[in-house]
């Protein structure tokens, strides 16, 4: 978790709150959910506060990012694009993960098109 927090600036990628300080508990969240074939690799995990991790539910990264913006939060689109790009590269390197690759690529297209 320490590497992920350091990489993501010790802030929740969804709401922008500083995490792992005081009352905001740090978690890591799978960008591509395990139920969608997402591996438990560092490339597929981002820093998230417990609230955002729990509230995202089964929304895609693109859907949850839009919801976070609607709520007036400050999601880190660049961190999500970076994670999805890194995951795609890792899948190319390691092989397999067809479901996760397709999901990651579709979300990457959505996030880069909307920016």
Predicted regions and their residues:
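Short cysteine-rich loop/turn motifs with clustered Cys
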Residues: 1-26, 49
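A detector for short metal-coordination/catalytic motifs
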Residues: 43-44, 51-115
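Generic anion/oxyanion-binding catalytic loop in active/binding sites
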Residues: 1, 34, 38, 53
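Histidine-centered nuclease catalytic patch
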Residues: 16-45, 62-67, 72
